[in-house]
Design a protein with these regions (language model features):
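Alpha/beta-hydrolase superfamily serine-hydrolase fold, recognizing
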Residues: 2-321
């Protein structure tokens, strides 16, 4: 009898691990813990120029989230604000993963807001989008009297965060955010910064095979819910490469060349160029260096530092300070 119970428990556990999105979500969350950032040679000098305000709350009282503020120490006037949504495959990651990079951006004369948001599978689509809108409402109300130029917003994201902010941009352009009016207008967003994001999710769901198919389906179930409950158009709706991007603001797009979404990023650059949206695409051939997913945070690499320099030039071209 006991042997049967043990066997049933083992079988049940294996089936749960195979069919439920929770086990793989937990594993991936652990993989993303701590981020991948490495130090730049001039880190100490850069960090000495900026200040941080950590763990400011936003959102509704029953589901509060938190954001960090990084800005120059010496500031006497309002400045453009970069709002950054972190990556983590929708199930992991943290605002602190962006802190070092945010300090470099702040040293250029920008305020950087790095937000946390509710993670899958506990919270599912479109919760992060609503939380981004909640954060922008919070910043617009400016309870903390931050020196934000709210007419010069830059939306930024890495990995899953890049997909989230690019999707949110579409709703701002249409002025229809799930039947509501977005917190901001398209005129207030001066540019998008997109790092290592997936911009065409539908093919991953419909054409992937083998172990990768199993992994993708578990992650999609974690974020969107079980496939049987997902409207057939959702994967198209969240895939930027299947949408009209002609009214997008200027975009900065980069990706690594090893086990990331470089091909999709290059296609997005081409799409934006075709519709005359100003775009800067930064990519490196594998003959130069093998650059993994989220390489931009690895500032011990010369390519990451080169990308940061190009990003600074892009921001200078598209903001007023």
């Amino acid at each position: 009898m006991y042997k049967k119970i043990i066997i049933l428990m083992i079988v049940g556990g294996v089936m749960w691990a195979f069919f439920s999105p929770r086990p793989i979500s937990w594993v991936i969350k652990q993989l993303f813990k701590g981020g991948v950032a490495t130090s730049s040679p001039n880190e100490a000098q850069v960090f000495a120029k900026v200040q941080t305000i950590n763990d400011q709350s936003y959102g509704k009282s029953q589901a509060k989230q938190y954001y960090d503020v990084v800005m120059p120490i010496k500031t006497s006037q309002s400045m453009p604000c970069i709002v950054w949504v972190h990556g983590g495959a929708y199930v992991g990651g943290d605002k602190e993963d962006v802190t070092a990079y945010a300090k470099h951006l702040a040293s250029f004369g920008y305020m950087v807001i790095s937000m946390n948001y509710s993670l899958a599978p506990k919270a599912q689509y479109p919760t992060p989008l609503f939380e981004l809108d909640d954060l922008l409402t919070e910043l617009k109300e400016n309870r903390h009297d931050l020196p934000i130029d709210f007419n010069q917003l830059i939306l930024a994201g890495d990995s899953a965060g890049a997909q989230i902010v690019s999707e949110y941009m579409r709703y701002v352009i249409s002025d229809n955010f799930f039947g509501q009016t977005p917190s901001i207008t398209k005129q207030q967003i001066k540019s998008l910064l997109l790092f290592c994001g997936p911009y065409d999710i539908e093919p991953f769901v419909t054409t992937s095979t083998g172990v990768f198919r199993w992994l993708v389906h578990r992650l999609m179930a974690a974020y969107f819910g079980p496939a049987r409950s997902v409207n057939e158009t959702v994967y198209q709706d969240v895939s930027l490469l299947q949408q009209d991007v002609s009214e997008f603001p200027p975009c900065f797009i980069t990706d690594g060349n090893d086990q990331s979404f470089e091909e999709q990023a290059k296609r997005l650059v081409t799409r934006l160029e075709q519709v005359k949206v100003p775009v800067t695409g930064v990519f490196y051939p594998r003959t130069t260096a093998i650059l993994p997913h989220e390489y931009q945070f690895m500032l011990d690499k010369p390519e990451a530092r080169q990308t940061l320099e190009e990003l600074q030039a892009f921001l200078n071209d598209h903001t007023l300070r």
